[in-house]
Swiss-Prot record:
It comes from the Bacteria. Residues 220-224 are annotated as: G2. This is Translation initiation factor IF-2. One of the essential components for the initiation of protein synthesis. Protects formylmethionyl-tRNA from spontaneous hydrolysis and promotes its binding to the 30S ribosomal subunits. Also involved in the hydrolysis of GTP during the formation of the 70S ribosomal complex. Residues 69-79 have a biased composition (Basic residues).
Amino acid sequence: MSKIRVYKLAKELGKSSKELVNILNDLGVEVSSHMSTVEDETAELVKGMLQEEDKPEEKISKKEPDKKDRKKTKGKKQMTRTATQKEGTEHGQKDTDRREMRVTVNPPLSVKELAEKADIPVNRIIKTLIGLGVMATVNHQIDEEIVKKLIDKMNLKIKISQGEDKEEKPDKVQTDIKDKPEDLELRPPIVTVMGHVDHGKTTLLDVIRETRVAESEAGGITQHIGAYQAVVQNKKITFIDTPGHEAFTAMRARGARLTDIAILVVAADDGVMPQTVEAINHAKAADIPIIVAINKVDKSNAQPDMVKQQLTEHGLVPEDWGGDTICVPISALKKKNIDELLEMVLLVAEMEELKANPDRPAEGVIVESQLDKGRGPVATVLVKNGTLKVGDPILAGYTHGKVRAMINDQGKRIKEALPSTPVEVLGFSDVPAAGDYVQVLEDEKEARAIAEERLQKKQERDLQHDGRISLDGLYQQIKEGGVKELNLIIKGDVHGSIEALRESLVKLSTDEVTVNIIHTGVGAINETDVNLASASNAIIIGFNVRPDSNARKLAEREKVEIKTYRVIYKIIEDLKDAMAGMLEPELKEEVTGRAEVRATFKVPNVGTVAGLYVKEGFINRNNKVRLLRDGVVVYEGDIASLKRFKNDVREVKEGYECGLGIEGYNDIKEGDQIETYTYREIKRTL
């Protein structure tokens, strides 16, 4: 017998999927979501019943008893709960003692650690997580939001730490405003498009912007502010058009959600790639629904079934394969099935029941920020709740201000922004950080006082010993009981090396500390890796790869340790020594200069000479040299020659050009990166 999906039946009946799920459950038909199926016979019965209910005479007589029944049921549930509570208290002091003995946890933490704290088997937690749609292993890191769900679902006798150590970054200011259910209204969903480089994220966003924004705003000029709104079936969808934006991870570090839905773009000819896995991990960690857009299906070598198979290996089972992950085959270039994809976004949003209260002071998130020469500090704010108005006193992280002007994604000045609306805001005292909470307070004086107090506390914290984990201080932190889990992110040049390294490092776990690999990937160390390390208090291990310029700067700012190696056993040795507290004084590598190869020349009897432009530091004739191609180390050796014009020189500084030859190596190509370095002897302290 054929079947029909709930959302399709809801469409035919002119009802929302949520309403139909409730109706079917009331009738005793077991369905869990809009993707569940019902038999045609059941569908016909439901159609007939609803048509009968729609008759004017019977409408009142049928609906009234339903309400009473619901009230009775609610009453019964409340009575049962009260009775249970009474029974519990009659058992004397036992329950009170249990409540008092609640163990405190400080997310993010591993499944194994949570099981130990809660004193329950690990497999019970894993089973419950699967029920919540989270595919996790023993060493999988779970954030605060998921821990809360587990506490509610499993009635765990644990509580989440609210201590000072948790308040590393400024959070929301607590207010007395409570949102009443009757004040809440449906708001547009906020969507992030994620995926691997060159899989079509930008093309998809451009197509949606061109077609849907142009339709809604005739003659409107689209302005790039980091987010925009599209109109589909007279409903708005907010897109964050900076894929893989650091705000996504910055918000996850505080256990909050920036987006409601993630569209994962996977190329049908390429399949699941390292950044695809990275995106899946981020979306799962943030606990948001994923819609997969299988792009480039118009290509002759497209293999959508291969993509679906690969997705199942990462816990995303397509709905046509019996799972609950929506997969839509599209071609962003040829604008094929874009409307169907957007319909699925609206469908998931409907099931999520996204609501906000527009009649309250606004709260939101900084998506992008910059210092504009003419306008001063400018930030794109995504309003999450309330309505942001011109003249509102605002607080965001360590900055404050007053909304002087607001510009929407069409480049028009507006006076107020409703929930889920992205706006460019002028009036901050300083440039806020991406991912900071934005709040409207009573007056500007209060906002200034809180911002100054936060800044002072941050400066005091920075002066104290930094709590970030490093190999040098690892043994001392283990001894003091400060470390129970060593989180690592591994980046390498090839998959085989990464897997070999992963297996070797996990075996180093001891009774005092568990080695937990939270993410692996092929390619150069980037900002996303540093953000993830910052959020998870992890060390980044690079094998035959180096961090890019932005990642290095971010790591310095976030105090994330990046260790790079050429030999696997050296990584294992260092970790063993760090964990055993036997770190010997070592030679520390110091990068002295970075340059770009802009041309190459073949010189008889000499070999290939690279024409360089020095971008950072200086190139010294006596330093070691490293050649990088696409972030991967290709060769390391000595400098054979260094010239300015025709003269041999000892040193060339930043901003100058020079010619450089590498001892015993000629395969230099235009676009390669050159790093020069020296070794400095440093004494390790614990």
